[in-house]
């Protein structure tokens, strides 16, 4: 998720553009909210024009789709506002159409947008991870269940949780007159979009309906407030931990140092092992197909984590 810090951005300020990538049918428009220029992963506001039709097919990148207005039909099932779809890479979904049009958010997590017409899954696809739900109608609001927690008045609906990274996708709301007076930063990337309503943040000002941010790790944000409340959709790439404090002048390096110091005290044995191990490629026996060479930062005893290995050629069907 190597995208630059973007905050604030309001998609109402830019026009839609026609989707012209190979494979995509005509009738889809987009507004680019954030983009990883290395691998093409991106977040977009999308518009399906009335009469849009897409045949059965799959993407080489997993993606998430959230419908904000209008409706789409997948197979014979109609999905209206509040509908969330997670499609793993290589999983083919049924024909998609939008007779009257729809707007939504779409997230391509690990690669550029792609569409390949197909009525069957890729041989390595994980269909068991496919998920579709109408979060407005079929999920309850809950208080945040992570600690340290946000102030009372902020509630969530968890749409997807990654058991390996602990990254998650969630709806969230702030009640009218919500406020929180401290400052926070996280060890993860965090992005959010305001479906409705405005909130205020000390560093970045007001974020209205259509407002968006992509926030990289260790960026101070807060205090927070919302006069009338908001409804938003948020995502993280790894576990969300709230490092709260009250000093608005700390920088990224100081926040990193503080987080590392906390790790030393919270997980001392793990910290010592990570720093003393030579060729540091820990293998998770539950995820043996994801050895650290391919999907995680690591080092070879020299402490240099930003390096690359030659990629093995992948066969595509």
Predicted segment positions?
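Long, low-complexity, intrinsically disordered segments
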Residues: 291-317
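Ligand-binding loop in jelly-roll beta-barrel domains
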Residues: 28, 78-79, 89-118, 188, ...
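Short, flexible domain-boundary/linker segments around small modular repeats
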Residues: 37-50, 163-178
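Ordered, small/hydrophobic-rich secondary-structure cores
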Residues: 11-93
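Histidine-centered metal-chelating micro-motifs
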Residues: 52-55, 73-74, 81, 85, ...
């Amino acid at each position: 998720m190597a995208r630059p810090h973007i905050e604030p951005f309001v998609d109402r300020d830019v026009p839609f553009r026609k989707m012209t990538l190979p494979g995509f049918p005509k009738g889809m428009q987009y507004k680019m909210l954030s983009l990883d220029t290395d691998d093409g992963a991106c977040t977009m506001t999308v518009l399906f024009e009335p009469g849009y039709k897409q045949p059965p097919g799959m993407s080489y990148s997993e993606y998430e789709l959230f419908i904000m207005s209008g409706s789409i039909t997948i197979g014979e099932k109609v999905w209206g506002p509040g509908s969330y779809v997670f499609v793993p890479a290589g999983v083919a979904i049924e024909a998609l159409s939008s007779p009257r049009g729809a707007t939504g958010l779409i997230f391509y997590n690990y690669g550029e947008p792609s569409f390949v017409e197909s009525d069957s899954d890729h041989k390595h696809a994980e269909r068991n991870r496919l998920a579709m739900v109408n979060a407005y109608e079929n999920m309850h609001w809950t208080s945040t269940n992570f600690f340290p927690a946000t102030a009372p008045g902020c509630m969530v609906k968890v749409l997807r949780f990654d058991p390996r990274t602990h990254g998650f996708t969630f709806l969230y709301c702030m009640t009218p007159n919500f406020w929180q007076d401290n400052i926070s930063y996280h060890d993860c990337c965090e992005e959010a979009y305001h479906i409705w309503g405005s909130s205020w943040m000390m560093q970045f000002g007001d974020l209205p309906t259509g407002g968006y941010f992509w926030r990289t790790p260790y960026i101070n944000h807060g205090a927070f407030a919302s006069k009338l409340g908001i409804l938003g959709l948020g995502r993280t790439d790894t576990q969300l931990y709230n490092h709260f404090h009250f000093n608005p002048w700390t920088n990224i390096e100081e926040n990193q140092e503080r987080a590392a110091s906390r790790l030393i005290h919270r997980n001392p044995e793990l910290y010592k092992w990570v720093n003393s191990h030579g060729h540091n490629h820990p293998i998770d026996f539950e995820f043996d197909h994801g050895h650290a060479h391919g999907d995680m930062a690591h080092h070879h005893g020299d402490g240099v984590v930003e390096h690359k290995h030659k990629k093995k050629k992948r066969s595509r069907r």
